[in-house]
Amino acid sequence: MGYISTMSLKPELNILIPVFNEERTIIQVLTKLNKVCKPIVNKNIIVIDDGSSDVTPKLLEKNKKLYSKLVTSPVNKGKGSAIILGLNEVSSGYVLIQDADLEYDPNEIPRLWEIVISNDIDVLLTSRLSGSPLTRVHYFWHKLGNKSITLMFNIINNTTFTDIYSGYIIFRRKLVHTKSLKFYGWGQQAEILTYLKNRSKKVYEAPISYKGRTYEEGKKINIYAMAPVVFAIIWTRLRILFFKD
């Protein structure tokens, strides 16, 4: 009942789900989203199929009631490209990006959304490392790498984030200009967050639980992802400072 009083009002929450060969989890994710986000009246669930070659497209075709819109790419161009396609389908309200692999639990969304609308927040970044109720043990080098790039981001942007690569960010759509985005790989989240921080007045962080996958379960990130992330942080900040981007 605590959620319903405010969630029946605008603004709108647009949940973007980039998908590539997620036949094992996509219907589970969509079903769970529809269930836990039912109190959020003003919402859109937008699926972006980034050239899946398994049965994901057929599953989506058979379950149209589980989403508001389906955007398809004929070939796989990467998550960054899929996110841009999704953002281009949204013109107002807020955006949240939900991965299709269930590392991030949709049960968290109503609580996070309540925080955003109750406090009129521009950007809410979540953290797996700040008082999270339950977090699966990380790979040591992943955690060290994440802490390193978070520290660099904080120094360059004068912030105090604890986990800049947490998968859940809720932000006002108007704060991200897709034509300004130059990164399509691992660096894109750092690029987007840099723009968000520098275009926002009210930026907050909230803890979430996290169930990270193992490499056997399909985890893809590795140490080589750090280089484009570092470059994205520095390059985007320079663009903002010198080109007023």
Region locations from a protein language model:
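Short beta-strand/loop segment that forms part of the nucleotide-sugar
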Residues: 34, 41-51, 71-73
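A conserved acidic beta->alpha catalytic loop
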Residues: 49-58, 102
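Hydrophobic helical membrane-anchoring modules
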Residues: 1-12, 156-159, 181-245
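Donor nucleotide-sugar binding loop of glycosyltransferases
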Residues: 22-25, 52, 79, 105
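Acidic donor-diphosphate engagement hotspot in glycosyltransferases and nucleotidyltransferases
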Residues: 29, 56, 83, 107-109, ...
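Acceptor/aglycone-binding surface of glycosyltransferases and processive sugar-polymer synthases
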Residues: 69, 73-89, 94, 106-186, ...
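Short, well-formed alpha-helical segments that are part of the catalytic scaffolds
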Residues: 22-37
